[in-house]
Amino acid sequence: MMMNKMVVANLVHRPIRSLISIVAIALEVTLILLIVGLCYGIMNDTKNRNAGIGADVIVQPPGSSFLSGISGAPVSAKIADVIRKMPHVTVVSPVIWQIATGGGIEVIDGIDINTFQALGGPFQYVSGGPFQGPDDALVDDFIARQRRVKVGDTMEILNHPFRISGIVENGRGARKFVPMSTLQELLGASGKASIFYVKVDNPANIDAVVSEVKAQPGMERYSVLSTQAYLSMMTPSNLPGFRPFIGIVIGVSTIIGFLVIFQAIYTAVMERTREIGILKSLGASKVYIVNAILRETLLLAIGGIILGIVVSLLARIGIQHRWPLVHIDRSNGWMLAAAIIAIVGATAGAIYPAFKAAQKDPIDALAYE
């Protein structure tokens, strides 16, 4: 109890240094939670929106994957007619995926609205309605909120003006939809498609349909996957650079915590020469001195962790309110991981100053008094 009072008194006696240390550790925790949450948020949002399309099987041209082959229209849209004639197939919807880079990277879906809605049900319109003409477009509610657009406004997509005919609820693949025929014309790809979404009469027949498509002459090299298998590939281990990037973020954050605590505790030890000398002259052991300094470090770390978690949660709310398209996942597991990382980094930074304090000779420590 006496030691705890002394530790708290030391922190209160130097409020600015204590506050700076807490803020630095909070920065470390916030950095980890926001960046990791952003990475997982982008991945999981993409995964959820693909699941929301409602397809059971996804057919892509040869060499495609969930990361590649998503732009342009490399194959004939008539493949949809071939697949549609197969047993157990109820709906086939050809779609053009086109990457646009204006104002950020995004995917535009060129759709046949009737077959696309047959996959997972009609679009849920927040306002407006379906395409009324070839130059109409649908956007989801997140795009509408962030870009501050409404039904009837004109939006430029792929350097072409489109009238927004409807705003739909998010979660159905892309965030912008245009008529497939219009996108084919803009790309000079008449009668072409990028991907085929297939609906099956019974989930038990999904594997049979996958095998049937792969066995179709001329389609042996196509990528044919059940939606479940397709989505299961969207994991950190399958995303190039995902894990190394997270590792770098954690490493940089840990170094920040280590250096700040090292500097703060080392300086504090140098300033407490007299106090340490008195404690040792009264019989305090080396273990007692080390224990006191590590407890002080632990209190700073706990304060920084609590502040960092609170700041990250508030920042997440603020970011998603200001930029609805930015998704930041909140994970209790990563909160625990960030707390452990902060404590380990802070403790590592305090070990050398703590042992240096424990080695001080009481006579030398009091020599200038």
Stretches found by the model and what they are:
Residues 46, 212-259, 268-273, 287, ...:
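Peri-transmembrane interface segments
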Residues 30-107, 208-217, 221-223:
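Hydrophobic, regular-secondary-structure patches
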Residues 57, 143-144, 165-170, 191-217, ...:
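A short beta-strand structural signal in non-transmembrane regions
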Residues 95-96, 104-114, 124-182, 192:
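Hydrophobic secondary-structure segments that place a key small or acidic residue at a functional site
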Residues 331-369:
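C-terminal membrane-exit region of the final transmembrane helix in multipass inner-membrane proteins
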